[in-house]
Amino acid sequence: MLSLQTIAKMAVATNTYSKCHYPILKVFGLWWKNNTLNGPIKICNHCNNIMVGEYPMCYNHGMSLDIALIRAVKERNISLVQLFTEWGGNIDYGALCANTPSMQRLCKSLGAKPPKGRMYMDALIHLSDTLNDNDLIRGYEIFDDNSVLDCVNLIRLKIMLTLKARIPLMEQLDQIALKQLLQRYWYAMAVQHNLTTAIHYFNNHIPNIKPFGLRCALYFNDPFKIHDACRTVNMDPNEMMNIACQQDLNFQSIYYCYLLGADINQAMLMSLKYGHLSNMWFCIDLGADAFKEAGVLAEKKNRRVLQHILGLNIFKRELIPPCKDPDPYQIQILLKNYILKNVSTVFTYYCQ
């Protein structure tokens, strides 16, 4: 049951006040000051979001109670930790990022179950497995700059996160800091499952994440996100094509890069190198004709049948009508249920 003081503070925080009331709000404990915030604390009647400063009372502003609580714990702001817990924030999330004995004791006194051992990893996995915008954001806030992860096996953690994200998060295991790895992990999970609220949040809170966002869009075959990312990220079309070819059946990503001027012969060879034959056949449909080089590569990979097929002079090229501009709507309509035409040509040849 909420105390009378808690109810009174919540009632005050649901209203907007002029600057002449600010000294009273500070005394009342409804003020948040740190490196980035300095203003009165408000709580939205509709969504329970916490707002700081001169924001209107409406949806999609501020931060959730849990996020506010997590940040207060990281700042070791005892009064705000108590306030946000009383208002309904989950103190168990705060306990996961309490890095000092005093904050750990405070969280425990407020009802948190002290996390131990694998509970940190279990929480990280759980928050990403729910495939929910709010949980991904909570996971990012809890584990960003969280020293409790210093004690885990870093190589094992990096491998696990990469496998779950289904996209290469780094070129080599020792080339990326844990902080950056986790940021990429949360972002990749959001893009992979089209969690738009989380994507927008990460774009605003993770520095220099947009180039990785373009990589995710290419890898997960999303022409709309590719189109949006290309407005702010300058990447060579051939580099984009290399990323697109790393995942099979990425026809829409490959076609987008092709329209930007990427080398379709190199895309054909890269697709074969990665073992993604559907991508290779799609490149041939687009007009790729690097059959001699592909035959040599197929021989090196001990694909004798494919080597023989690539030596046949039966293929038709430029079977897909080109678009003037890389329009994601046209690309999706054109390729959503695309059937590889030169694969059909091969079947027809051998069935005659």
UniProtKB/Swiss-Prot annotation:
InterPro entries: ASFV_MGF360
Pfam families in UniProt: ASFV_360
Keyword Acetylation: no
Disulfide bonding pattern of the chain: none
Induction comment: Expressed in the early phase of the viral replicative cycle.
Biological process (GO), any one: taxis
Membrane-crossing residue ranges in chain numbering: none
Keywords recorded for this protein, A-Z: Early protein
UniProt function note: Plays a role in virus cell tropism, and may be required for efficient virus replication in macrophages.
Protein family: Belongs to the asfivirus MGF 360 family.
Name the record gives this protein: Protein MGF 360-16R
